[in-house]
C-alpha cells in the first residue's frame, strides 16, 4: 500500500479557528449568556415591509439586529461599499458588513414572564421533576396555570406548621375544610382556639397504641350511656372539656386508619389531664422541642377496622362543633389527606382556596403559579448540599426502586455541578432568536411569499409577549393575566417542540408547523440531512451505458458535462494561454470555441473523477476513474465495475464528482481508482470479475467440439496454429496438438504413418501421476495468449487448458492478484473483457425454444412419484405415520424427483456438446451453455424452463419453517410446455411473495446497515500491536456432520497467537505473531491440525479502536491492514450490503422453494475404523441396536490418509456397524463401482420416544379432549392421537412404563407428540412409545434470515427461550410439578454440585435421564438466549456463539463474509460493563460504563492501593450501544436526538471527537485513513490529529 503524508501550509486568518480545538461541550445556557450572543432585542412580530420589501426595524428580520441584507450597504443607503467596513450608520443603526452575517447573528426576546423549556420539563425523565421530586402531571398543573404551589410553610399563631407545607400543590374540593372553618360565622369565634392548633405532621405511632384508643371509644360510649345522651352529645361534652382546659385537640388521618392524639400545652394541663389519666392507659409520650417550648404529646389509638361505623356517627358531632375539620371516614374521600402527611409531597391549591385561606391567615400563606414558581423553587436548591443528602440517602435505603430514583437525581445534580450551570436556567427568561437566514422568507412570483415555519412560531411568541405586557400595565384581572401567561408558555413550547404537544400548532391546510426540534431530528433534520450528508458543487448526474472499449481505470464522461464540471480549470488555462480577461474567457466558454475543446481534453487528461451509484451500500459504491470524453449525454461505465456498483444498464443513473484539491486528486488516484478495487472488502474474493457476455464469450472460445474442421492436426508452434485458424483450415474448437503445450506423439500409435484417433484423445496420466489434458484447441491458445507472461515468454499462470466458466475465471483472477499483483490483474481483466465480448459476438448465441429439451423420462418419474405418494397416504390413513411425517415425506419425494429430472435434463443438454458436429446443426445448446458457464441464469431457472417447475413456497408465517410452508402439490409442468390454470395460480403465490419481500425488506436491510455503521464508526486501526496474549481458538466449522468451512479458509489473513508445530514431523509451521498466508494454511491441513489460536479483534486490548495485529489482513487489499483504516465502517458495510442484496434476490427464482434436505443416514465411502463417543444403546425386539443418548458422536477414521470425519448420531438412530469395527469397501468387479457401507440411519422427520425396559404402558394425565386430541388427517382421513396444549396447569401428560419388578420409568409427552402405543399395552425394550414431529422443511430464504440477524445484533431475548444448564453434569428428570412443569436436575458427579431447572409445560425436553450435559447447553427446545450464555459461560463463548449464528444465516444464502467483520460488531456490543461493587471509585452500583474507562480507573485505584471496583460484562444491542456512545454528537445524529441533547446539556457533556461521525458533523477531516496522520491519545482523553497541529503552528 502507498502511505500518503500531506504537508499543507494554511494562510493565517484573524477569524475564529474552527480546527484548533479538540472537544465540543454542550450545556444549558444562562440568560446572560443568551444576551451576549444576541445583537439586539426583537420587539415586533413584523417581518418585511409590504411596499419596500425591506425588513422592519426591531422585527424578526431587522437589519440593525441581524446585519445588512446587501453586502457593504446599510439599511437606509447612506453608507455603501467596502470602504465603510465596520461603520455603524447613525441614521438606521445598521453596521456596514457582509450580508452573510445574517447566518450567524442571533437576536433575543425578553419574556414578560419566565417560561419552562419543554425538553427539560417533559422529555422523560423530566429533569425539573427529578430535582423537585415532583410528578410530571403535578408540574404541568403548575406550569400551565391550573393550580398554585405553596412556596413556604404556613404557620399558625403558635408557630406550629399548618397543613400547607412548602412545595405542596393545593386544589379545591380538598380544602373545603378551610372554607368551613373560617367562613362559618357560628363556629368562627367559638372554636378559634381549636382552629389555631390544627397540626398535621407524620408521626410514627407504636403498634401497641390500639388499646388506648379503644378505651377512648369506650369513654365516648360510656359517657353517652351513663348520662343517657347520644354519642354526638357525649363527643360535644368531651370537646367542651378540652376547650375549658385550653388544650389543643388534634386529628391525624391516613387512608385506612384514624389516630386521635392529644397535644397538651405544658402551661395548662387542666382538668382534662386528670380525666384522661384516670380513664386512659397511657401508651407513649413524645417530647417535641419547638421555639423553646416543650410540647408533650400523648397518644390514644382507635382500632381501625371496627371503628368505621361508630366513628361515622360520631363524626357528625365533631363536624358540627368543629366545622374546620371534616372528619368523614369514607374511603373515597380520604386519599387526598395522605398527601398532607408526606414531607416530599405537593398539595395544589386552586384560586378559590387561596382566597379563603388568605382571608383567615392574611399573608402568611405564600403561593405562586406558573414557571415563575418553579424557577423560584429551583433557585433555592443548593447543589452541594443536595448531593451530600442524596449520597446519605443512597447508603440508608434498601429499596431498589428508591435507589434508582436517587441515582437518577444524583446524575442530574452531578451534571449541573460538573458543567457549572444552575438548574433555574432550565426555565427561560430570555429566548434566543435564531439568525434570519436560517429561517428565510422568500419572495415568489405573483407577490406571494414562502416562509419558514419558525417565523410563524416566533411571531406568535412576540404577539403574546407584547399582549401580556400590555394587559399587565392595564392591571387586568389575574385570571386574564394567567391565561395570557399560559398562552405564552404554549407558544414557546410550540417553537421548541411542536410535535410533542397534545394539540400541535398548524398552518395552512392543517399542516403541523416544523419547530426547532423537528429541524434537528429525523432523516430530514439538521444532523442527517445537512451535517452528515451535504450536497456538493462540481457534480453531475446522467444515465449510464456500457463502455466495452474502456480500460478498467477509465469512464466515459459526456463532453457537455465535462465542460461544466471543469469550467474553472478551463477558464484558468484560457486566461493563461490567451492572456485574456476572466470575462472574455467565460464568453469563449459560452460560445464553445475550438480552443475550449482542446483545453478540455488537456485538463481532463490527468484529473480523475469519482463515480457514485445510489444506494451506496459499501465503499465500492464510489470509485475513481480517469475521464474519457465521449459524445452524447450518457456516462459510459466499464462493465467489470458493475457488480461493485450493483449497476445494470436498464436506465440506472450515476453521479459524477470532481476532486478539486491536489490532495483529493491524489487520494482518488492512489486509493479509490477502480484498478485498486478488484477485491471485495466483505470476503476478500475478487469482485471485478467477468460476467454475462464476457463469460459466455470466453466459455465459447475455450470449448471443444468433435467433428469440426482441422480436428486431429498437429502444429509446431502457437503462431502456426493461429495462422491455420485465420486461413480457416482449423476450427476454433477443433481438438489439436501443439508443440510446447501438449505431447506431440500419441502413445497408442505403432508407427508414424498411422493417423491418430482423435476420439481416444482423452485425459491421461503423466509420470508423476497427475492428470493432464493431452490436446488443446485454437480457442484456448487465443485465450492463453491474453494471460500474463514471464520475461522468457512462458505463461506466468501456466497454460489454462480447460473450458473457462465463470468459476474458473474468478479463480484465475484471484490467483493472478495473489501471485502477480494488482497491475497485471488489471491488464488481464481488460483482455478477458475484450476477447469475451469479441467471441460472444462471433458465437451469435441466442435462445431458441427447441433448445429447451424436456426429458423423455419425466412422465415416468412423475408417475412413480405419484405412486409412492399414494402409498404414503395409505400408511397415514392406517395410522402408521403421523400427519407431519406424511407431509415431510411427500415434500422429500417431490424435491428428489425435481432434482433428478433436472439432472437428466442437464445431461441431455450436455450430450449435445459431445456429439460430432454436422453442418447446419447447433454446436452447443445455448441455454445449457449460459447456465453451465455461469453467464446468465441458474440450474434452477433452466430446470423451470424445460424440466419441472417444482415445489412452491407459501406466503411465510413461521420463521422457523413450520408445516405447510411449502405447498405440497408441485408444479409438474415447465414453462416450455406451459402451466395449467391451477399451476399458474399456485405459482402466483411465490411470485407475489418475492415482490412483497423486496419492497418490505430493502428498507429493513438499509436500517440494519445504518445501525451497524453507528455502533462501529469509531473503530479504527490506531496502533500496530496492542501486545495482548489473549486470542480465540478456531478450527473447522461444522453444522451437525456437514463441514461448513474448513480451517484453512477461516485462518487465512489472521495473526497466529502462538507457535504452531507439526507434531509428527516436528516442524514449525507458523511463528507466534506471524500472518497466516494461504500456503501456511494449506500446511496446517496437511499436518492434520484441526484447531489453532489466532489474534482477534474480540480480545484486542487497544483502548480506542483496534490494533493491526489483532485485525490481520485487510480483505479489500489482501495485505496487512494499515494504520488509520476505518475497519468499523468496513465491517458494517460488509454485513449490511449483502442483506440488501439478498432481499432483492428472492424474487429472481420466482418463489420456487429450494429446500434443505436433511441427512438421515451415514455411509462409509472409504476404508476406515468406526469409533463412538457418549454412546448409550439398547437392543429392540428385531435385534436392532438403538441409540439412547442424545449427544452421541461417530468418528470415522479413514486410512491410509488418517482423515477423520465426525458425525452427530441422534437419539433413536439404528446402528449397523459397532464401536471399534473396521470397514472395508468392496468394488464391483463388473462395473468397477464402489459400494458404500451403511453405518447408521434414522428418521429425519420425527424424534421417537423409546422404552428402555420391558413393561406395561400406563397413560398419566392423557385425557381425551383435555390433553389428547383425536385428529382426523385432512388428507389421509386416518385418526391420530396427538397431545395438545391444555389450560390446566396441574396436568402433565406422560407415559409411565411399569417394569416387571414394580419400579416405574416416566416419559414426559410434549405438545404435538403423536402416540404410537395404547394404554395398558405390553412393550419391549427398544419399542417406540410416541413420536415428536421435527419441523425441518425450512426454505432457504433471507425473509427468515434478516430478522434473525437483526435479533442477534440487537441482543434480543428470543421468543421461545431454551432452558440452559449452568453446570456440567448428569441429567435427572425429577418429574412434573403441581403446575405440570417438568423439573430437571443437573448434578456434577465430581463436585457434587446440583442445580434444578423448571421446564414449562408443553415445551420439548431435548435431554433424557442419565444424559451428560455441558455448561451452557440447552435442556429444552427453543433458541438460546445470548445473555444466558454470557452469564453462564462468559464473554468469549457469547462472542463465538453470535459470530457463528450470524454467519449461519448468510452462509445459507451462499454469501461470504469474513468473520472479522462480525467480530468487530460483536466487540462493540460487549464494550460495556455493569458495576457490581463500586469500591473506592466514583462509580455507583448498577451503573453501565465503558470497559476501557473502567479498566483505566481500576488500574489507577489499584496503583494507589485502594479498593478496586468490580464489574461484569453485559451484552448491549447495537441500538443501545450506539445511544450509549461517549460522543453525544454521534448518538444525537443516530436516534432520539432531542432526548440525547437534553441529557448532554444537563450534564454538560464533552465530546472529545474521537469517532468519524462527530468529525464529519463539525466539518473536520475524519480521524481515519489519510486524516489520521498522527494520533496521540493521552490520559485526559485529549485527541490531536495532524490538521489540528497544523492549525496550532
UniProtKB/Swiss-Prot annotation:
Q: What CDD domains is this protein classified in? A: RNAP_beta'_C, RNAP_beta'_N
Instruction: Could you list this entry's UniProt keywords, alphabetically sorted.
Output: DNA-directed RNA polymerase, Magnesium, Metal-binding, Nucleotidyltransferase, Transcription, Transferase, Zinc
Q: Which GO terms describe its biological process?
A: DNA-templated transcription
A Gene Ontology molecular function term of the record: DNA-directed RNA polymerase activity
Q: Which PANTHER family match?
A: DNA-DIRECTED RNA POLYMERASE, DNA-DIRECTED RNA POLYMERASE SUBUNIT BETA
What is the organism of origin for this protein?
Endomicrobium trichonymphae
Q: What does this protein do?
A: DNA-dependent RNA polymerase catalyzes the transcription of DNA into RNA using the four ribonucleoside triphosphates as substrates.
Domain of life according to the entry: Bacteria
Q: For binding Mg(2+), which residues are annotated in this chain's numbering?
A: 648, 650, 652
Q: What name has this protein been given in UniProt?
A: DNA-directed RNA polymerase subunit beta'
Indicate the quaternary assembly.
The RNAP catalytic core consists of 2 alpha, 1 beta, 1 beta' and 1 omega subunit. When a sigma factor is associated with the core the holoenzyme is formed, which can initiate transcription.
